[in-house]
Amino acid sequence: MANENTRIFLVADGLEAMERAVMSLARIGIDSVEGVLAKGIEGWRDQGLPIESIATTSAAETAIWMQLGRVQVLDVRDEYEWNEKHIPGAMHRYVGHLESDLPLLPRDSEIVVHCNVGHRSGVAASILKRNGFTRVHNMLGGLSAWEKLGLPLDGPGQSRKAD
């Protein structure tokens, strides 16, 4: 996670978006933006520069992969969210502690990362990729998408549906 020593470079689609990002960072105490990619990712791509991406998957596809024993699901929500409800068989590692927990994660498995809707899991997937995990997917819609499909959950008050 970013702190006062983190080098910050922004990717923004125009001046207004850049100003909003700088203001948002300042509100949380980060005021040392080192550079801006003002024409966004498209400008970067137009220059022929390399782009990294994170694979995505749906909740439905994740459920199928789990049934086939093909993936390890990684829940990066807060502990209280995990205790309330979680996907059966998922591993829990809070995104804020993920870098220190990397040795606990399976490097030889496909990993599907999720949070509640997809924001924190995007950050977590980026952390994993940056640290050499190559088989990483971000589950679109997170646990909210999983619930909407009526897929099983564990936790207090959750009625786990039959497999």
Task: Give the role of each language-model region.
Residues 1-72, 76-163:
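Rhodanese-like catalytic fold shared by cysteine-dependent sulfurtransferases
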